Amino acid sequence: MARYRCRRSQSRSRCCRQRRRCRRRRRQRFRARKRAMRCCHRRYRLRCRRY
């Protein structure tokens, strides 16, 4: 299972790439949807949650 954590020290583009991966996973796994939303939502761009 993929784990993404975007830190403020990371570049924004790197964080966005991680979010894109996370979005793909969200489509694949309906059950993980809430957690994926937390990770991928624009509001959490600089601090993605691990799951």
Curated annotation (Swiss-Prot):
For this entry, the protein name equals Sperm protamine P1
User: Can you cite an annotated GO cellular component?
Assistant: nucleus
Which family does the similarity line name?
Belongs to the protamine P1 family.
The record's InterPro entries line, in alphabetical order, gives: Protamine_P1 (IPR000221)
Q: What does this protein do?
A: Protamines substitute for histones in the chromatin of sperm during the haploid phase of spermatogenesis. They compact sperm DNA into a highly condensed, stable and inactive complex.
Which Pfam families does this UniProt record tie to the protein?
Protamine_P1 (PF00260)
Any GO molecular function: DNA binding
One biological process GO term for this chain? chromosome condensation
The record lists the organism as Colobus guereza
Q: Keywords in UniProt for this one?
A: Chromosome, Developmental protein, Differentiation, DNA condensation, DNA-binding, Nucleosome core, Nucleus, Spermatogenesis
Q: In which tissues is it expressed?
A: Testis.
Chief subcellular location: nucleus
**Where does it localize?**
Nucleus; Chromosome
